[in-house]
């Protein structure tokens, strides 16, 4: 077989025609005549060659392509793509004060005396993408995914009209980022086609764009009216330009679509004027927008500000006001989460708000129901802002029917019937029955296998529920013995409703694959209360390895003061979260489960992804007022260089940077003979590393 990387377009066309005929013959023999002509591996090699050719030359996809045929073995998932620079989300601003706070944070962080120009642009309500060019040729298209790892959509992105496949006069490696969307009228036309073909309609333009782009068959994507805008670079933007406005000008010259509706603001007044203009005229735009994005225009200043865990410090999204609607509340159901918290949910007469069909809304907590006097059959006001879960704002008392019914706060868990525990002020109600509560156990397993945890594909909500109901799994550990149990059972999983030979084979492969897991993902997968992805990374970074994690958690539960203080010094981990961690490890079954998982999983040690330097893993404390840089900038720089910045001085501290009016921390550092430097020495140090 020819090397696909070197093949010409003419050769590819001929080879695709040959493959189509050959695979069609093999499909007929295999599926119709039950008489395979080639081995599975030989068939797969031919089929994969066809797919790779179509990915490289999507405009050459044939009408009789084997990738379109029912009998063909179409790939069941996209390849993973790791983003060299994370595609983080933006922080939100909901009113003018939030925006002023954003501007003030920039001034304070950078110690600026005047307004730094802000680039303003519409926030398109679409699907984020990354496109990588090597030597000017598009090589990879990817979704944002979880911000760190996305899905390879190269073949699909090449089908979008006017999307450049080749560009000139750019660096050897170039990444651009943007938004793929569907215009309003195209969305209506697409839904009309879906309805005529007896298919489900899309809820909104964003879902339509996402569903169209994430097609395993690129020819389906090609038929969808997708459009795009680029709005930033990734790895190389500073090599192209020194500011956001210059970058967009350069990208436009390269042939990319940019949104011409933008504003370089030189004051807060200009920011708000642009926001009001877009808010007033948003309905006249051909596409959906849900706010305005503000970015520091100067890339050098952006670089100084850097990022926090989930978003850049130098940008924010000013969201448009929430859209209000009214509908009838049909009933109130109660959900039990993986940590036992009970949440009331309003079941509603379906209503369309801002292009989205809403049939459920959050009621937050039981006290909220009483405070707002919400009753079953009431007509309620709903609020929806962006992708936030809709919430009930209040009741239309003028329309209250005579037959409304009040909702009684439960005294016993609806899943396990154990007595509920009322938290302070009755705001939170919790079932403390742990894994003996079926609902908590189910949610815990669902969390364990989820994408950002163990990432076991093929174990969705329905599959987990099925396996629990059939007694095949009762805890996360059972998942890894599922194949062994299935092999020895007379009632095979592949013969049960909703399963098949291929889906079961894929599930077992994915379970096996998941056994190699990073320490942060493993900690997150455990489902400890208040330990989300970021806190899991903080803990993983602190302990370093699985064995250290187990050892330190067991010391923590025995109230070892040094361990408690060390973890308490981590930013994001405080007394409340430490209590939750201790409560989790106080449960004997939890420790046993984690140790057994440790025996069968390959839990990788924490890998530092930040810059490595002489400051890496050094514990640094800043105290007093620094003359020329803000404390926030100093802390951000230290962390970027691999240091751990803590709030308090201890015997573990490596360095104290003391500014003006340094107090007790400086005194303690001297008592412990810890190295102390001033701001000037700090700036020299970071310059040299």
Swiss-Prot record:
| GO biological process terms on file | DNA repair; DNA replication
Q: Which InterPro entries match?
A: BRCT_dom, BRCT_dom_sf, DisA/LigA_HHH, DNA_ligase, DNA_ligase_AS, DNA_ligase_CS, DNAligase_adenylation, DNAligase_N
Repeat as a keyword of this entry, yes or no, is no
Q: List, alphabetically, the Pfam families matched.
A: BRCT, DNA_ligase_aden, DNA_ligase_OB, HHH_2
Q: What residues make up the catalytic site?
A: 123 (n6-amp-lysine intermediate)
Give the GO cellular component terms, alphabetically: cytosol
Needed co-factor(s): Mg(2+); Mn(2+)
Which chemical reaction does it catalyze? NAD(+) + (deoxyribonucleotide)n-3'-hydroxyl + 5'-phospho-(deoxyribonucleotide)m = (deoxyribonucleotide)n+m + AMP + beta-nicotinamide D-nucleotide
Q: What EC number(s) has UniProt assigned to this enzyme? A: 6.5.1.2
Q: Does the keyword Membrane apply?
A: no
- Top-level EC class as recorded in UniProt: ligase
Q: Which Gene3D superfamilies match?
A: 5' to 3' exonuclease, C-terminal subdomain, BRCT domain, DNA ligase/mRNA capping enzyme, Helix hairpin bin, Nucleic acid-binding proteins
Q: Name one GO molecular function term.
A: metal ion binding
Q: SMART domains this protein is in?
A: BRCT (SM00292), LIGANc (SM00532)
Residues at which Zn(2+) binds: 413, 416, 431, 437
Q: Where does NAD(+) bind?
A: 40-44, 89-90, 121, 144, 179, 295, 319
The residue ranges of the BRCT domain are: 610-689
What keywords were assigned to this record? DNA damage, DNA repair, DNA replication, Ligase, Magnesium, Manganese, Metal-binding, NAD, Zinc
Q: What does this protein do?
A: DNA ligase that catalyzes the formation of phosphodiester linkages between 5'-phosphoryl and 3'-hydroxyl groups in double-stranded DNA using NAD as a coenzyme and as the energy source for the reaction. It is essential for DNA replication and repair of damaged DNA.
Protein name as it appears in the record = DNA ligase
Q: What is the lineage of its organism?
A: Bacteria, Pseudomonadati, Pseudomonadota, Alphaproteobacteria, Rickettsiales
Q: Which gene encodes it?
A: ligA
